[in-house]
Swiss-Prot record:
Superkingdom classification of source: Bacteria
Region (Disordered): 1-42
Record key words, sorted: Sporulation
Ranges annotated as spanning the membrane: none
Keyword Protein transport attributed: no
InterPro entries recorded: SASP_SspL
Cellular localization per UniProt: Spore core
GO BP field: sporulation resulting in formation of a cellular spore
Primary location recorded for the protein, binned into one broad class: other
Chain intervals with Basic and acidic residues compositional bias: 21-36
Induction: Expression is sigma G-dependent.
The protein's name: Small, acid-soluble spore protein L
Source organism of the structure: Bacillus subtilis (strain 168)
Length: 42
């Protein structure tokens, strides 16, 4: 039962969607920020 609960929590629609959205937005913002910082340093 505990494993099922954990699996349900980890495999829930909201957490997965949030994680996916964050992962999709994070890399882009991080790359953009890094590129901007690199350009500013140059």
């Amino acid at each position: 039962m505990k494993k099922k609960d954990k699996g349900r929590l980890t495999g829930g629609v909201t957490p997965q969607g949030d994680l996916e959205g964050n992962t999709h937005n994070d890399p882009k913002t991080e790359l953009e920020e890094r590129a901007k910082k690199s350009n500013t340093k140059r």
